Amino acid sequence: MKKIIPVLLLVVFAFYFQGCLTVETKEYTFKVKKDGSGEAVIKYINIMTDSKDSAGIPEKDYQDLINSYIKGDKLQEDYPHAKNMKKRLFEEDNQLCGEVKFDFDDITQFKFYKYKDKGPWCYYVTSSLGMFGGEQYFSSNGTYGGADMPVIFWDGKEKEFKFKTTVSQPAKNTMSLIDLWKSKGEK
């Protein structure tokens, strides 16, 4: 028992001081063709670390963003049906933003649903479509069913589906990664 307590404390300590990437909002655009294929753009607005005051964690989170998401395969793992993926970071309104563009063969592989190919298009707004979880509905060009039925409906004639989600509001413990990105010059 005496040996277990220090190990448990070490695990708790490591977990508590581990950084985490987050984002303020995400904007999704899916353009679909008659055959169900198309192209998508996902924009990540205000990429942040949630460990502003932890020594070295913002730098670690930034390196994770670059190495795992931008240069690495993390986004491809999050969206395995995406083809011809292009990723970039950029500055907008003094915030670090990211953008992922890709093609797809079938929009239903990205949580869209159309009942018997006749009804309206539907999208169930759950916690995430990949990178930076914990999403909440904010707006769309469709009709939102509300908190009790978190589904966006489109009448079936649209060829472009747009929606925006919120993830994390800036807070005392968060810090935008824009200054690190500017200082590193990785574009």
Place the predicted regions along the sequence by residue:
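Post-signal peptide N-terminal segment of mature Sec-exported envelope proteins
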Residues: 28-46
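Bacterial Sec-type N-terminal signal peptides, specifically the leucine/valine-rich hydrophobic h-region
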Residues: 14-17
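Residue-level signal for secondary-structure boundary sites
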Residues: 38, 48-50, 106-110
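Short, surface-exposed coil-to-beta transition loops
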Residues: 23-27
